[in-house]
Amino acid sequence: MKKILVVLVICVTSVATAQDRYTNGMQKAFQLWGEQKPTEASNLFERIAMAEQDNWIPHYYVAHVNTIHSFGEKDFEKLSKQLEKAKEFLDLAKAISPDNPELMVLEALINTAWIAYDGATYGMTLSGKNFQLYEQALAMAPQNPRVVLSKAEWEMGSAKYFGKDVTPYCKDVEKSLELFANFSNDTPFYPSWGKDRAEVVLNQCGE
């Protein structure tokens, strides 16, 4: 009986230690990102992802950091490297967590980064994919504020490109803000971004 108890204590302690390492590592990576050190943050998220191969969350953040910091990048080589890494870790996350609307939104953001860099080259092939991704994500998670916001912002961008009125999509941005107020998930470090962006986009609706 004593041996069983000792084994149980060791197992529980090992799990707790691993969880502490994960939590501390993720917090440090977010700190680096907040300090405008995206490369260092990405590298740390990547090391955590390699240690947490059954957890899609750190893989998500490797992809997210590299995607966000690709917008506005003019150097094609740097952009390609970042977005290829983003896609690599997105695919790993999708293998762990298939049919995940958060990952669908992220995939659409990766596509949008390519389109923003060169719409003439990438717009025709990736715009249709984004439409499908957002429709699929919305069907699966209509109460997810990032899904609602990202779909609305994509449609607003498309409307602006073709010289159409963006007003019909402003109500969806407003809806996303309502959803942000109530949305929660118990998974540690689950994506929570978007509210500030929704407020910016909604203000633009009034201009």
Where are the regions that the model predicts?
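N-terminal targeting signals for Sec/Tat export/insertion, comprising classic cleavable signal peptides
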Residues: 27-56
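Bacterial Sec-dependent N-terminal signal peptides
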Residues: 1-25
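Short coil/turn connectors between adjacent alpha-helices in alpha-solenoid helical repeat scaffolds
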Residues: 29-33, 70-82, 114-126, 158-168
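Amphipathic alpha-helical repeat scaffolds of TPR domains
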Residues: 20-28, 51-73, 99-118, 144-159, ...
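A contiguous pocket-lining binding segment that forms or flanks enzyme active sites
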Residues: 122, 127-160
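TPR/TPR-like (Sel1-like) alpha-helical repeat modules
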Residues: 81-88, 124-135, 145, 165-184
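Canonical positions in the second alpha-helix
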Residues: 48, 93, 136-137, 176
